[in-house]
Structures are given as C-alpha cells and as structure tokens.
Amino acid sequence: MVKIENAHEGVIHHAALNYYGTRLATCSSDKTVKIFEINDVNNSSSLLETLVGHEGPVWYADWCHPSLGENLLATCGYDGKVLIWKESGHGGKMQIIGKHAVHSASVNCVKWAPHEYGLILLCGSADGKISVVELKDGQIASTKILDNAHKFGVNSISWAPLMKTDSSDDGDETTAVKQFISGGNDNLVKIWKFDDDQETYVVADTLEGHKDAVTAVDWSPTTLLQSYVASVSNDKQCLVWTQDHSSKKNDWKKISVNEGKFEQKLGSVSWSLSGNLLAVSDDDKNVTIWKESGDGKWEEVVN
C-alpha cells in the first residue's frame, strides 16, 4: 500500500488513478490539481507537478484510456469550467489543450467514454445540464448540450461499457450503442442512449426509487446476461438496478443493498473492474464492500 501525504492547502474532493496506476491526480478546494507518480515496487510516491487553471474548488478528475492519449486528463470545478490537460512529451509538464466553458454553474463531474468510441467527454453540471464533448486531433470538435437533464443539478454520471445490439431483423448485424447514466438533485436516476435519427442523446429510462438527492451513480463494467447500475443518495440508500438482456421488456428492476439500513448519507459508489464487487462510502468516512449472493441479495464482505 502506498501512502500519500496531503500536499494541498485545502480539502481534497477526489482522487483518480490513471489506467496503469502509475499517476494519481488529486483535486482540492485550493483550486489546484496535483499529479503524483506512484511506485508500487517500493511503495512510494512523489509529487510531479501542480496544475493551476481553475478559478475555484476543483471537484473531479478523470484520466483518458492510454490508447487515445498518454496521460490525458480532464478536470472540472466550481468555476463552471472543464479543462483538458495533456503531457507535453515524455516526462514533460501537463499543459491545457482544451477549455470547455458552456455551463452557467459548477461542473460537478466529468467522465471519458469507453475508448472504443473515441475521445468523448461527458460533463454534468449544477445548472441541470449535461454536455457531451468530442475531441479530434487534440481539439474540441463538437459539443452536445442536454438541457434540463436534472432539475436542481447533476451530481454524477457514468458511461455504460461497450455493448452491441442487433441492428437487423435476422440478427446478423450488430451496432454499438452509446449509453450513460446520470443522477441528480431531483432524486432521479436516468438512462441515456444515443439516438441516430436525432443525432443526440435521449432519455431511455427514468429510474425512481430514491427519496433525496442522488449523489453518485456507477455502471458496472460487466456485459454478460444483465446490466448492473448502482446509485446512492442522501436518503441513506444504495440501490442496484438490473436489466435482463434476454428480456424483450428491458425493464429495470431494483434491490436495496443492506435493506436500507445505512446510518449515514451515502456519497460514493463504485464497481470493481470485474463488476462483482460494489464499494459504498458514507459521509462518516466508512467504506463497505458488497457482493451479490446466489439468491440475488447483496452481502457485506468487507467493512
């Protein structure tokens, strides 16, 4: 385990490892992002540089898949901006190559799409809108704005893994479908799909079950028999939503993890890379790990 000392002058809101686990980006209220190099051989870390560009607290960071750009990073913050950073040469400093400033309020979350789709960045804002930014040749090429995504603001977003569906009557042809999930202060979880006819993302399903603001959502990386989506909320609930791929109804079913017995508001949820474990954290700094049992219930495996 690598221990990293806090090098910020303010609260750390988020930390993100790159694909290889060799770089860590930390976001803080001190308006900066710090980049650490991680060496798991000798369990050490070193501060590489401090990124300055935001004019307020920085909430979130996300590294792009290395196949689309080595050490390409997106950050967002209270200033309503999304900054895209790229390392200038091998071992060089991170430089801003893109600035996305279309939102009228804090940008709370950013997520790169699965690398198979190319350089596409998803952004959720407190202004209630979601924007989808596409980059080509290192430049912002197009932006789609999804108005009124969530009343009172968007708190969390997550892409679905690459999934293909039959695009012909005989089932011989398949098409990749871009999908993502969002959660907001309207207590709702929404499933979005790209509509080829409208050339934008539309709401495919609205999932109701929370009684307070949805603080975090995550789409499981597994693409087998079912899709799994997890959401947590200020209502102290963690809900797991499942969709059976073999069913023609495509309905989403929900089950409450821990039967709604969490004692604190929940602020974060994350699937393991294999999709079989679910991590949930609360406002009292507790983290629990859950796994689905044979009867479909969720059992705690680590506290």
From Swiss-Prot:
<dbReference type="GO" id="GO:0005789">
    <property type="term" value="C:endoplasmic reticulum membrane"/>
</dbReference>
<keyword id="KW-0853">WD repeat</keyword>
<keyword id="KW-0653">Protein transport</keyword>
<dbReference type="InterPro" id="IPR015943">
    <property type="entry name" value="WD40/YVTN_repeat-like_dom_sf"/>
</dbReference>
<feature type="repeat" description="WD 1">
    <location>
        <begin position="7"/>
        <end position="46"/>
    </location>
</feature>
<dbReference type="GO" id="GO:0030127">
    <property type="term" value="C:COPII vesicle coat"/>
</dbReference>
<dbReference type="GO" id="GO:0005198">
    <property type="term" value="F:structural molecule activity"/>
</dbReference>
<dbReference type="InterPro" id="IPR037363">
    <property type="entry name" value="Sec13/Seh1_fam"/>
</dbReference>
<keyword id="KW-0906">Nuclear pore complex</keyword>
<feature type="repeat" description="WD 6">
    <location>
        <begin position="261"/>
        <end position="300"/>
    </location>
</feature>
<comment type="subunit">
    <text>The COPII coat is composed of at least 5 proteins: the SEC23/24 complex, the SEC13/31 complex, and the protein SAR1. Component of the nuclear pore complex (NPC). NPC constitutes the exclusive means of nucleocytoplasmic transport. NPCs allow the passive diffusion of ions and small molecules and the active, nuclear transport receptor-mediated bidirectional transport of macromolecules such as proteins, RNAs, ribonucleoparticles (RNPs), and ribosomal subunits across the nuclear envelope. Due to its 8-fold rotational symmetry, all subunits are present with 8 copies or multiples thereof.</text>
</comment>
<dbReference type="GO" id="GO:0051028">
    <property type="term" value="P:mRNA transport"/>
</dbReference>
<dbReference type="GO" id="GO:0032527">
    <property type="term" value="P:protein exit from endoplasmic reticulum"/>
</dbReference>
<dbReference type="Pfam" id="PF00400">
    <property type="entry name" value="WD40"/>
</dbReference>
<comment type="function">
    <text>Component of the coat protein complex II (COPII) which promotes the formation of transport vesicles from the endoplasmic reticulum (ER). The coat has two main functions, the physical deformation of the endoplasmic reticulum membrane into vesicles and the selection of cargo molecules. It also functions as a component of the nuclear pore complex (NPC). NPC components, collectively referred to as nucleoporins (NUPs), can play the role of both NPC structural components and of docking or interaction partners for transiently associated nuclear transport factors.</text>
</comment>
<keyword id="KW-0256">Endoplasmic reticulum</keyword>
<keyword id="KW-0931">ER-Golgi transport</keyword>
<keyword id="KW-0813">Transport</keyword>
<keyword id="KW-0472">Membrane</keyword>
<keyword id="KW-0509">mRNA transport</keyword>
<dbReference type="GO" id="GO:0032008">
    <property type="term" value="P:positive regulation of TOR signaling"/>
</dbReference>
<keyword id="KW-0677">Repeat</keyword>
<dbReference type="InterPro" id="IPR036322">
    <property type="entry name" value="WD40_repeat_dom_sf"/>
</dbReference>
<keyword id="KW-0811">Translocation</keyword>
<feature type="repeat" description="WD 3">
    <location>
        <begin position="102"/>
        <end position="143"/>
    </location>
</feature>
<feature type="repeat" description="WD 2">
    <location>
        <begin position="53"/>
        <end position="95"/>
    </location>
</feature>
<dbReference type="GO" id="GO:0006606">
    <property type="term" value="P:protein import into nucleus"/>
</dbReference>
<keyword id="KW-0968">Cytoplasmic vesicle</keyword>
<comment type="similarity">
    <text>Belongs to the WD repeat SEC13 family.</text>
</comment>
<feature type="repeat" description="WD 5">
    <location>
        <begin position="209"/>
        <end position="251"/>
    </location>
</feature>
<protein>
    <recommendedName>
        <fullName>Protein transport protein SEC13-2</fullName>
    </recommendedName>
</protein>
<keyword id="KW-0539">Nucleus</keyword>
<dbReference type="GO" id="GO:0090114">
    <property type="term" value="P:COPII-coated vesicle budding"/>
</dbReference>
<feature type="repeat" description="WD 4">
    <location>
        <begin position="149"/>
        <end position="202"/>
    </location>
</feature>
<dbReference type="InterPro" id="IPR001680">
    <property type="entry name" value="WD40_rpt"/>
</dbReference>
<dbReference type="GO" id="GO:0031080">
    <property type="term" value="C:nuclear pore outer ring"/>
</dbReference>
